[in-house]
């Protein structure tokens, strides 16, 4: 698992953010899902491979999974975070959900087997055979695919768009019989109104939408929220946008206790840009110096005169002369 995936999963394990992601993406910011009603439940599922023994199983792991408990009702919410477009994603999500339902079903069957064995229930023949009581119910599973990559999502958004109905020559008939399985897709780079989010998910999504646009980032960082980020949000932004300088110099931009103890990304970004400009000017000066040395060599100036005119060391002149000789050989 890459550092980006680990970073995003850790970021979303926070119940406030997890609830905000669902509320902001699906309910226009309305607090339908409450953090205090969530219980972390991320886990792996054992899936038997075909043509292999029962002991040979493949582990499928949920990225982030939470139980939502509201009164006597239990729901299962899960997020699959994607940095790259996955053209198999609708099937993957359907499989994760199926594994979750199978897990619940096995637990019900085990419970009912004990009750039947202890003669605490009187099942019908059908109930005994399947070990599921007519009144048994499963908990609904809701899986969201969160795409936070740079490129537009050009993959399928439901099972329908992975099908080849025309291949059999009966496209219309096949499509009428087919039962779709929609995928719950949220693309960070398609978010235009982020006011529905009320945690630092908003700041992360905004920065992700400005990747590659320095002026856009500068304008965005005028928002005072970026002047007082939490350490985890700082690290998430630095990792997902591939800014190693922000991770290296993190402590440098931490505010004092009186200032709020947050991290000031606005100041950090401005300093990084200033450093880049300084490096660019220095590289420009070096390129200009190299060009002058080459011209003086071509005009047969002595090394002593070149050193005096350009204020460089003999080693620099030798390197320029050697580089020019290599070009002539090529």
Residue positions per predicted region:
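Elongated, amphipathic alpha-helical interaction scaffolds
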Residues: 1-330
């Amino acid at each position: 698992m890459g550092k980006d995936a680990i970073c995003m999963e850790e970021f979303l394990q926070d119940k406030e953010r997890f609830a905000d992601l669902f509320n902001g993406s699906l309910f226009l910011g309305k607090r339908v899902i409450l953090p205090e009603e969530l219980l972390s439940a991320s886990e792996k599922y054992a899936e038997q491979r075909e043509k292999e023994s029962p002991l040979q199983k493949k582990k499928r792991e949920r990225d982030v999974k939470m139980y939502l408990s509201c009164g006597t009702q239990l729901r299962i919410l899960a997020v699959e975070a994607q940095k790259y477009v996955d053209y198999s994603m609708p099937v993957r999500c359907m499989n994760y959900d199926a594994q979750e339902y199978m897990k619940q079903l096995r637990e019900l069957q085990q419970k009912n087997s004990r009750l039947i064995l202890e003669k605490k229930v009187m099942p019908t023949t059908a109930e005994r055979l399947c070990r599921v009581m007519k009144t048994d119910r499963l908990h609904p599973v809701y899986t969201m695919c969160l795409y936070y990559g740079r490129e537009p999502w050009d993959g399928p958004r439901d099972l329908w768009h992975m099908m080849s109905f025309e291949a059999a020559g009966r496209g219309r008939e096949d499509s009428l019989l087919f039962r779709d399985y929609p995928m719950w897709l949220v693309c960070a780079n398609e978010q235009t109104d982020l006011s529905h989010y009320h945690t630092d998910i908003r700041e992360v999504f905004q920065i992700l939408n400005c990747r590659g646009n320095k002026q856009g980032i500068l304008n965005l960082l005028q928002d005072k929220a970026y002047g007082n980020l939490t350490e985890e949000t700082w690290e998430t932004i630095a990792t997902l946008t591939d800014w190693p300088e922000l991770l290296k110099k993190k402590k440098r931009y931490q505010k004092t206790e009186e200032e709020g103890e947050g991290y000031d990304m606005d100041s950090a970004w401005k300093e990084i840009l200033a450093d880049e400009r300084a490096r660019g000017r220095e590289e420009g000066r070096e390129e200009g110096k190299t060009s002058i040395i080459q011209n003086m060599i071509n005009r047969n100036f002595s090394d002593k005169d070149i050193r005096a005119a350009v204020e460089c060391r003999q080693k620099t002149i030798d390197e320029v002369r050697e580089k020019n000789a290599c070009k002539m050989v090529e």
